[in-house]
Amino acid sequence: NAPPNLTLR
């Protein structure tokens, strides 16, 4: 899974 930071943006 991609980092949450990238998911939010």
Swiss-Prot record:
Removal of H(2)O(2), oxidation of toxic reductants, biosynthesis and degradation of lignin, suberization, auxin catabolism, response to environmental stresses such as wounding, pathogen attack and oxidative stress. These functions might be dependent on each isozyme/isoform in each plant tissue. Its EC number is 1.11.1.7. The lineage of its organism: Eukaryota, Viridiplantae, Streptophyta, Embryophyta, Tracheophyta. This is Peroxidase 8. GO terms for molecular function: lactoperoxidase activity; metal ion binding. Binds 2 calcium ions per subunit. It is an enzyme of class 1 (oxidoreductase). It comes from the Eukaryota. The keyword Methyltransferase does not apply. The keyword Glycoprotein applies. Belongs to the peroxidase family. Classical plant (class III) peroxidase subfamily. It catalyses: 2 a phenolic donor + H2O2 = 2 a phenolic radical donor + 2 H2O. Keywords: Calcium, Glycoprotein, Heme, Hydrogen peroxide, Iron, Metal-binding, Oxidoreductase, Peroxidase. Its cofactor is Ca(2+); heme b. Glycans are attached at N5. GO terms for biological process: hydrogen peroxide catabolic process.
